Amino acid sequence: MSKRPSISFSEFEVPQKGVAVVLVAKGGGFADEAAKAVGDAEKIARIADISGFTGALGKTAEAIETTPAGVEKIVLVGVGEPGKLGNDDWLKIGGAAFSQIGNAERVTLTLALPETTIAGDEAADVALGMVLRSYKFDRYKTRKSEENGEPKHAAKITICVADTHSARKAFEVAEAVADGVIQARNLVNEPANILGPVEFAEEAEKLEKLGVKVEVLGEKELKKLGMGALLGVAQGSVRPPRLVVMEWHGAKGKEKPIAFVGKGVVFDTGGISIKPAANMEDMKGDMGGAAAVTGLMRALAGRKAKVNAIGVIGLVENMPDGNAQRPGDIVTSMSGQTIEVINTDAEGRLVLADALHYTNDRFKPRFIINLATLTGAVMVALGQYHAGLFSNDDELADQLYDAGQSTGEKLWRLPLGTEYDKMIDSKFADMKNSAGRYGGSITAAQFLKRFVGETPWAHLDVAGTAMGSPANEYNQSWASGFGVRLLDRLVRDQFES
């Protein structure tokens, strides 16, 4: 696996060896501290001129140059217009900086800009961007550093910033969030022959060491609860299903919890309605929603969030054996509502139907947010830069949208309505699990809405963003961990501010 850098914060100092990284604004402006870090201002101007570097956000320039103090390499990182930087931009700056340090074991980043005060939380976001950029899933590669020129040791990075106390304090929180994102990425990247429902549940149980209460329900308990929708999906696999309930109690008193529910199909062949062979290997990531919920619970516990939160994940494998669910089957969900199975590849909503009802019925939460790699249709509508947002509550939808804007994990709201709801009515049961080609992501959301009652609820369709999304400055991984930072920000803004 990747070597995670060790990051510390310091007052401004002249780097003594290794790599010196400095910030440059659009148009070439830089702080006096940056000039001191590399020896003189002319070096920065010369490197920028030779490289055609303009200081645009996320762009870099580098030179193998020594300084009187012993630095061997200088890296310039563009920040664009300093007055317009947001949280996501500071992550981009950190990720861009990390991308240029190579095999260096000692790095000093001078975090200063002309006529600009960089706050402690902004410095922490830079550090978070570096940690997230350092991530690499290479667990199964037997030849690593000798082939790829990777460093033998993790980089030691010193970030020089004016307010070191605030930066350290903010990074304690950011590092817990990084742990959650990395866990989500690891779970999604893991191959399905290694990570089945049982193994996933075991990973979730490890959160107990952070103070999370974890309960794992097996097939016997699920049958007793009447989870016919979830069990119908699982019956084609020899690997038994699991429902994992994670509880974090961080609020004072007995406040009603907030709840997060994740779809955890550890591998999705499509079942009897089998998928085409091309790219089916990507369906190891069809548990991206469950991975995000697990990563979120780790982040909340790791930073001791002052909130009561519930995470519920339904874990199954969708396989086409002789006992598999068939098109035309009718199953009874835990809610008592019956479902005609039109397409066994519309299985995620069946898993979520029971998980949502269970969560709502048992915990009576303030709201429920579910995440799922639910439909290809949402990718047709939105591509891979936004996840689909559906909600029965405008206030919750607005809060989620704002959290997405501030973290860069962006959402776009799509409609719900009675016209779409009628499309999932069935001739033979209360509803059907697929309404056909048109409005596929919307009718899937309408299906889920039938299992949450009047509770404020939002559904995030992360099919385009949880895996295989375009790389950026702080994520080069196939699995992005999308949703962890977004929902952590929602919790901070709405319950801890």
Curated annotation (Swiss-Prot):
Residues bound to Mn(2+) 2: 263, 268, 286, 347
GO cellular component: cytoplasm
EC numbers on record: 3.4.11.1, 3.4.11.10
UniProt keyword annotation of Manganese present: yes
Active-site residues, record numbering mapped to chain: 275, 349
Subcellular location: Cytoplasm
Superkingdom: Bacteria
Positions that bind Mn(2+) 1: 268, 345, 347
Pfam families for the chain: Peptidase_M17, Peptidase_M17_N
Family indicated by similarity: Belongs to the peptidase M17 family.
Role of this protein: Presumably involved in the processing and regular turnover of intracellular proteins. Catalyzes the removal of unsubstituted N-terminal amino acids from various peptides.
Protein name as it appears in the record: Probable cytosol aminopeptidase
Protein's organism: Brucella ovis (strain ATCC 25840 / 63/290 / NCTC 10512)
Lineage: Bacteria, Pseudomonadati, Pseudomonadota, Alphaproteobacteria, Hyphomicrobiales
